[in-house]
Amino acid sequence: MISKLNRFNSALNSATRPRFALAVLLSFLLVTLAQASESPRQIRHALGVTTVTGTPLRIVTLFQGATDSAVALGIKPIGVVESWTEKPIYRYLRPALQGVTQVGLETQPSLETIALLKPDLIVASTFRHEKIYGLLSQIAPTIALDRVSEFKETVQMMGVALNREDKANEILFHWDRRVDSLRDRLKARFGERWPLSVSILEFREDHLRTYLPASFAGSVLSEIGFVWSRPESYTAGVMQKLTSKESIPVVDADLFFVLLRSDKPAVAQNYLDWQAHPLWQRLHAPQQQQQVYPVDNVAWSLSGGILGANNMLDDIERQFAGKAESVVKKRDIAKENATR
């Protein structure tokens, strides 16, 4: 009896295996035919026009914002560049990027590694990769973005290239709704004092950088409704590098968001040195109940993508819960003291 059962199971398995293999083959052929039947799309980007056929499935991203945007669009790249900190991949992206191949640094990606991955789309930036764009294009269709701090543009461009425009539009729709809601809450809390002025300060080992409205973080704060107190901030590029503490007055604002570039002791010491300067003590933010907020360097500066930008909104919502009134009151007191 047992022998008969074994023979039956063996016959059943022998009959099932070809069927399973045939089903897998048919599924692969259907996907391939579906991709082939789609019309080629002409993607206009910073370095020209690239033809993309079907839906790319093997993506290599060569800058941080592109990696972030791919994950937001529901794509797991086959290759990514190393993160600037929290190496090799930012912590907030690790769950989505387990097992992904590293293709080198953003400043110097490995063409050999990229070629071995056999991608069907490469996403690059003009700032980092213009000189190797021709070589990248020989490996696979390549699109290049000019302004990598424009995270919404990155989502839109990648949505088109990846044949996920609907998903990109959905992401941006929810972003707009969230920003509108946050702006309304801040307006209601601050009243006539809104909008408040802001400075984004990043401390490094030997200098301070202040990020302007054209920067990644600056564009997010500007969209919410924050302003910069100095008109020239809107035309001075992405950031200003300050090496002399005599320039402290140029960063004056109602609120400071402070980033430390790394956890090196020299960075923390440099921050303490700037704080100890008499000119720092005269600034509005330190005077107003210490309206100086430490924030995550990855989310606010290095992520460069829509997911990182949403993490910024998380920070702002947490940090301003129940604190706006104290800012307003302190600023009123400062004005009264100035007029006496």
Regions found by a protein language model. Name each.
Residues 2-22:
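Bacterial N-terminal signal peptides that target proteins for export
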Residues 111-113, 118-123, 141, 252-256:
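Proline-aspartate-enriched helix->loop->beta-strand connector
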Residues 66-113:
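A short, structured surface patch at a secondary-structure boundary
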Residues 62-66, 133-169, 176, 266-295:
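Charged, glycine-enriched surface loops/patches
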Residues 19-32:
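Bacterial N-terminal signal peptides
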Residues 58-62, 66-70, 170-231:
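Basic- and aromatic-lined ligand-binding clefts that recognize polyanionic substrates
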Residues 255-340:
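Structured C-terminal subdomain patch of bacterial secreted/periplasmic proteins
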Residues 34-38:
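Boundary at the C-terminal end of the N-terminal hydrophobic targeting segment
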